Amino acid sequence: MASSFLPAGAITGDSGGELSSGDDSGEVEFPHSPEIEETSCLAELFEKAAAHLQGLIQVASREQLLYLYARYKQVKVGNCNTPKPSFFDFEGKQKWEAWKALGDSSPSQAMQEYIAVVKKLDPGWNPQIPEKKGKEANTGFGGPVISSLYHEETIREEDKNIFDYCRENNIDHITKAIKSKNVDVNVKDEEGRALLHWACDRGHKELVTVLLQHRADINCQDNEGQTALHYASACEFLDIVELLLQSGADPTLRDQDGCLPEEVTGCKTVSLVLQRHTTGKA
């Protein structure tokens, strides 16, 4: 999904120059470019900062996470190029607006600002020390962390509804509730979002599978006309997009803004998968 933010030839050293006729060594020597070297070092430091952030999520404020999210997208994707989300009135719009507000900000500036905030969150951070491997470091900020951007308030067990359990990915509770018929698998919240919408938004693939097994309406639309496929696409969960398509989701359904699922994502791979599936059914 990421678009290159390095100048052409920055990785290979190719400056576009030609070998002079007097050089018979057979090896091309390119002029040393401090600018390219500086950009490469900045990009490397940015990637280290993104990896380090995974251990700082709990200490970062909501505003800081939004700030970091926007700059991560600016570096990896470029200028905001997706329609304003309508599937998630609060969180989705805030994330989109934070990214959109950067306008034509350069990737270099975005990387510098991102690194500065990570350093502020952890003044003792040493980029030279490798990050610990494992579950915490498996996802780059801006990937699966997109929807889990905020720390949600702790809700007492007795105050939880079925959507709270869905957000928590409590498969056992949801399965029992559906099997006992205490809850309709297609029940909707006040915004018209079904459990399947929520599971797709949060990236809970196993829960998505369970809901589909219990005959969740795969093409159910919320109050804005968006399907679960719109949600999975917008959040860039490729594996869930593929699961939905394999299970019969309709990629040709448009929301109230006239957008197809392929048009609400910033991920080229997700968009291509949806386009190919649509073409194959035509």
Curated annotation (Swiss-Prot):
Q: Which residues carry this modification: Phosphoserine?
A: 106
Q: What does this protein do?
A: Binds long-chain acyl-coenzyme A molecules with a strong preference for unsaturated C18:1-CoA, lower affinity for unsaturated C20:4-CoA, and very weak affinity for saturated C16:0-CoA. Does not bind fatty acids. Plays a role in protein N-myristoylation.
Q: What is this protein called?
A: Acyl-CoA-binding domain-containing protein 6
Positions of the ANK repeats? 191-220, 224-253
Q: Which UniProt keywords apply?
A: ANK repeat, Autism spectrum disorder, Cytoplasm, Disease variant, Dystonia, Intellectual disability, Lipid-binding, Nucleus, Parkinsonism, Phosphoprotein, Repeat
Q: Which PANTHER family match?
A: ACYL-COA-BINDING DOMAIN-CONTAINING PROTEIN 6 (PTHR24119:SF0)
Connected disease: Neurodevelopmental disorder with progressive movement abnormalities: An autosomal recessive, progressive disorder characterized by global developmental delay, intellectual disability, significant expressive language impairment, behavioral abnormalities, and movement disorders including dystonia, spasticity and cerebellar ataxia associated with gait impairment. Additional features include facial dysmorphism, oculomotor anomalies, microcephaly, seizures and brain imaging abnormalities. Parkinsonism may develop in older patients.
Q: Which GO terms describe its cellular component?
A: cytoplasm; cytosol; nucleus
